[in-house]
């Protein structure tokens, strides 16, 4: 049994920093561990243009702790009216690394998203031409589709066609939650990948609903049946390079989670790497952590792997029960739980 593990510095390929005063909590929490992060653009208003991404990037960089080398990888928010010229500007920038497809109404601050993903093929064509990755929140939002089926229906209705029509387009199936999603990524071409969150790896819908509703485990896409969780786990345990770390860390004030209509999102930034390590060790696959956390995402995004390292030590660490974020209490994912691994 190893008492420490040193890996190349990891990256987080999907997170939500939020904005304003919250950045003072979220940016250091990530930057102290991860070398880079794909930053979601679903602010209010959303980050629609390269110019807006540049301004947001500066606000993030202003909160990076002194002496810490961290690079935010910016993303633009696709809408029905995104011009092709904005895709070209993104491709020509050195800090915008992808465009994000949010079906309108699918998740937090997605009301400005795409109303019909099948009707923006001109944008997919431009992204393919200029080699700008497409990041997908893979859910439909039709009222008649059950919330637990939204990912499967999205694949059948939209994603399979997008993949077939644009074979040279890099696509990331963000926060994959179903066996159908895992199988889609496995069977698609090599320009298809998925990010995996700690909550979808470690939990299923029983952890949300059995014994009472647990609002701090509530996220979108929602937790699914155990069989879907096991499909995600298998992909990570076997070290499939199409699946890599993306926390989807997303803070909300406790008052907005513990409410009659609570917000979706799990704030996992501080605990993420120990959580992934704990899971992999439990499945005798700790040797897969470096690929999953440090190599596969960098390779997919065609960025250099980090040469510096981080070290995890076998030292019990209790996840804080509450974190002060801009004067608001935030309950983190796995709050109060003791993990066997901590950052050295």
Swiss-Prot record:
Zn(2+) 2 binds at residues 100, 137, 175. The active site is at residue 248. The keyword Chaperone does not apply. GO terms for biological process: 'de novo' pyrimidine nucleobase biosynthetic process; 'de novo' UMP biosynthetic process. One of its GO terms (molecular function) is zinc ion binding. PROSITE patterns: DIHYDROOROTASE_1, DIHYDROOROTASE_2. Keywords: Hydrolase, Metal-binding, Pyrimidine biosynthesis, Zinc. Its EC number is 3.5.2.3. The modification N6-carboxylysine is found at residue 100. The keyword Zinc applies. Its cofactor is Zn(2+). Pathway: Pyrimidine metabolism; UMP biosynthesis via de novo pathway; (S)-dihydroorotate from bicarbonate: step 3/3. Zn(2+) 1 binds at residues 14, 16, 100, 248. GO terms for cellular component: cytosol. It comes from the Bacteria. It is an enzyme of class 3 (hydrolase). It catalyses: (S)-dihydroorotate + H2O = N-carbamoyl-L-aspartate + H(+). Binds 2 Zn(2+) ions per subunit. Substrate binds at residues 16-18, 42, 137, 220, 252, 264. Belongs to the metallo-dependent hydrolases superfamily. DHOase family. Class II DHOase subfamily. Homodimer. Catalyzes the reversible cyclization of carbamoyl aspartate to dihydroorotate. HAMAP family: PyrC_classII. This is Dihydroorotase. The lineage of its organism: Bacteria, Pseudomonadati, Pseudomonadota, Gammaproteobacteria, Oceanospirillales.
């Amino acid at each position: 049994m190893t008492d420490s593990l040193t890996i190349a510095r990891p990256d987080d390929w999907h997170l939500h920093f939020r904005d304003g005063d919250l950045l003072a909590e979220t940016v250091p929490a990530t930057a102290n561990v991860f070398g880079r992060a794909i930053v979601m653009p679903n602010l209010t208003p959303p980050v629609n243009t390269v110019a807006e991404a540049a301004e947001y990037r500066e606000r993030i960089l202003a909160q990076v702790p002194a002496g810490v080398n961290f690079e935010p990888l910016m993303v633009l928010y696709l809408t029905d009216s995104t011009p092709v010229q904005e895709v070209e500007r993104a491709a020509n920038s050195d800090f915008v690394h992808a465009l994000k497809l949010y079906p309108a109404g699918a998740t937090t601050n997605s009301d400005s998203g795409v109303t019909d993903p099948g009707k923006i093929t001109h944008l997919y064509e431009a992204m393919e031409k200029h080699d700008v990755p497409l990041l997908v929140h893979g859910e439909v939002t039709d009222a008649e589709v059950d919330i637990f089926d939204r990912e499967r229906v999205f694949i059948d209705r939209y994603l399979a066609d997008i993949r077939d029509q644009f074979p040279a387009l890099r696509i990331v199936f963000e926060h994959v939650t179903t066996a159908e999603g895992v199988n889609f990524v496995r069977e698609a071409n090599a320009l298809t990948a998925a990010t995996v969150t700690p909550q979808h790896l470690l939990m299923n819908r029983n952890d949300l609903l059995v014994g009472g509703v647990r609002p701090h485990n509530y996220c979108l896409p929602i937790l699914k049946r155990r069989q879907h969780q096991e499909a995600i786990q298998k992909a990570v345990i076997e070290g499939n390079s199409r699946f890599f770390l993306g926390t989807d860390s997303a803070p909300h004030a406790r008052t907005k989670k513990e409410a009659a209509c609570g917000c979706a999102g799990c704030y996992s930034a501080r605990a993420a790497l120990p959580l992934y390590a704990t899971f992999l060790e439990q499945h005798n696959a700790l040797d897969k952590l470096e690929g999953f956390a440090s190599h596969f995402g960098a390779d997919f995004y065609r960025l250099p792997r980090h040469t510096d390292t981080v070290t995890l030590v076998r030292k019990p660490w209790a996840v804080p029960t509450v974190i002060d974020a801009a004067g608001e209490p935030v309950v983190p994912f796995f709050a109060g739980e003791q993990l066997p691994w901590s950052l050295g």
